[in-house]
Amino acid sequence: MAIGVIGRKCGMTRVFTEEGVSVPVTVIEVGPNRVSQVKTEESDGYQAVQVTVGERRASRVTKAQAGHFAKAGVEAGRGVWEFRAEAGEFEAGSSVTVEGFEAGQMIDVTGTSKGKGFAGGVKRWNFSTQDATHGNSLSHRAPGSIGQNQTPGRVFKGKKMAGHLGAERVTVQNLEVVRVDADKNLLLVKGAVPGATGGDVIVRLAVKAKA
């Protein structure tokens, strides 16, 4: 059973069931996740497995990174990620593949949402607009009041206002694995997953899977 894998979003398509029902799916390419380090309670204070995936030009790998990957006997990848794992479950140099998943499993997918630049409160937070007429001249899409009075005399941290929309870590839970193609290293997931085509996504077993 896979603890999780790092994949790359390829885009969306659809597959048909035997009854002819169209199912929208996201295609995730999951190359072999190479184990670059196994963290233990004794040396690191917690148990986890560190993986890398893909490749990176030698000129883009620092000496520290090169030594780290060489110690595990794996090729340098485009990044490193961690998954919590029990001791002895994995060893450095081994691989985690898409074969750890099977059709019908429920998974959680984490990615970086598409960046949409600077956005106002209506678009970013789904604020209601103000009156289009009846004396309203310039405040149709304005947020309105952002504070109270002399007390507290300030704007609270985290106040929903205009700002950068998207480009943040998002997790979609309880997506169904429709198909696993071990030959092509593909995972077909029902529905949409966060991020743009070509972006890295983290696929884990669902933490809130319904029994």
Swiss-Prot record:
PTM comment, free text: Methylated by PrmB.
SUPFAM superfamilies given in the database record: Translation proteins
Disordered, as annotated region: 130-151
Single biological process term from Gene Ontology: translation
Keyword Amino-acid biosynthesis: no
Pfam families: Ribosomal_L3
Protein purpose: One of the primary rRNA binding proteins, it binds directly near the 3'-end of the 23S rRNA, where it nucleates assembly of the 50S subunit.
Family: Belongs to the universal ribosomal protein uL3 family.
Name of the molecule in the record: Large ribosomal subunit protein uL3
Organism: Alcanivorax borkumensis (strain ATCC 700651 / DSM 11573 / NCIMB 13689 / SK2)
Classification lineage: Bacteria, Pseudomonadati, Pseudomonadota, Gammaproteobacteria, Oceanospirillales
